[in-house]
């Protein structure tokens, strides 16, 4: 357990909530990159970007609450916004998924509002990748498209009884 390792390294025999939080973030996002020197303009950009995610999450509300916003680099990220679900669910509504996509674009929107269209950065690349993947899943596998309706569009037909081809 990563939390126990952190407590032991600190010379403690009990695991604290801070140990568990740090362990969870380390596993999810990677270790803190404390030695990374971040220029002031980049810190400012990261701060606005992450707060953009937080603001969209706060305004949208819904099932995930903003738990933490940080500019401390971890893994490949310059900072991150951690949202936690209020309850665990096996299935997600279309609204929930669209809200999550909006949250992913909150960082890019903040960059554009604060710094202008010509000064947006590559910092949103992972956000765009994840949001695009979610949107593709919604349309091609989950039948959540207004245009196509409840159909499977990814080319597989696992449910075909006779595996016949459709021409």
Question: Can you name each region flagged by the protein language model?
Answer:
Residues 1-9, 21-22:
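C-terminal helical "lid" of AAA+/P-loop NTPase domains
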Residues 12-14:
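Inter-lobe coupling/hinge segments of SF2-like helicase ATPases
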Residues 21-26, 75-77:
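Short, conserved phosphate-binding/catalytic loop or strand-edge motifs used
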Residues 43-48, 54-167:
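Soluble catalytic regions of large protease machineries
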């Amino acid at each position: 357990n990563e939390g126990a390792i952190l407590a032991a390294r600190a010379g403690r025999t009990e695991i604290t909530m801070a140990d568990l939080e740090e362990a969870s973030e380390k596993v999810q996002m990677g270790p803190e990159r404390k030695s990374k020197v971040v220029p002031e303009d980049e810190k400012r950009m990261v701060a606005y970007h992450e707060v953009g995610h937080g603001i969209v999450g706060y305004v949208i509300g819904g099932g995930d609450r903003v738990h933490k916003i940080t500019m401390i680099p971890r893994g490949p990220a310059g900072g991150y916004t951690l949202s936690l679900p209020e309850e665990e669910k096996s299935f997600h509504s279309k609204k929930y998924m669209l809200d999550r996509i909006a949250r992913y674009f909150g960082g890019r929107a903040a960059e554009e509002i604060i710094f202008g269209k010509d000064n947006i950065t590559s910092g949103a690349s992972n956000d765009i990748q994840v949001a695009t993947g979610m949107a593709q899943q919604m349309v091609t596998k989950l039948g959540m498209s207004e245009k196509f309706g409840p159909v499977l569009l990814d080319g597989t037909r696992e449910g075909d009884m006779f595996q016949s081809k459709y021409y």
